[in-house]
UniProtKB/Swiss-Prot annotation:
GO terms for cellular component: cytosol. It is found in: Cytoplasm. Homohexamer. GO terms for molecular function: ATP binding; UMP kinase activity. Gene3D superfamilies: Acetylglutamate kinase-like. It comes from Ectopseudomonas mendocina (strain ymp) (Pseudomonas mendocina). Belongs to the UMP kinase family. Its EC number is 2.7.4.22. This is Uridylate kinase. Keywords: ATP-binding, Cytoplasm, Kinase, Nucleotide-binding, Pyrimidine biosynthesis, Transferase. Catalyzes the reversible phosphorylation of UMP to UDP.
Amino acid sequence: MAQQTSGRQPRYKRILLKLSGEALMGSEDFGIDPKVLDRMALEVGQLVGIGVQVGLVIGGGNLFRGAALSAAGMDRVTGDHMGMLATVMNALAMRDALERSNIPAIVMSAISMVGVTDHYDRRKAMRHLKTGEVVIFAAGTGNPFFTTDSAACLRAIEIDADVVLKATKVDGVYTADPFKDPHAEKFERLTYDEVLDRKLGVMDLTAICLCRDHNMPLRVFNMNKPGALLNVVVGGAEGTLIEEDAQ
């Protein structure tokens, strides 16, 4: 169930959490690790327990990637549609994990899938969020050529989220890949234009520009660090904050 976390007040009232599909694999090379799902459901439940409204977007890279399928010779639109369906599978798995923990959740898909998910409707999504349900946005934007990062930023803007939280395998944005370059330095704060000018690869160009144009703060943090998600939401200095004025 949604855990009550005493003594910690949230900095954000409504968040959009972006999880990569790869994060669901755990130590596996493909698919979904149920233990990872359960841990993520527990961490999301902690947020619900302190009154935070949570929207979720999950990638599909643990199952299919449209761009990779296209590179292998498949029609790009077909590949992207397969990638969208992969995000729906991940969303259903996450909803199941949340509901098993007695955390109310709903999947809203950008592609109509009657009997499987609800169809995305902004006004309905807002109502579900206000009643404390976790809303999982699936199937990206519903259009090919757009990443799930772009979908996350779009949904965050639509639902008037306070921040986009991008969960990654590193604790922020670095000057280079910290797994490959031991001298890579971490940024505490950045502006959108600095991310674009330095080609830091936090998100794709469309996603960053969406956040910049609508002044949507973005924080990149390490979801694998225990308690990091809760710490971010209560105002802790986790990861890297990207916003209009980084002074």
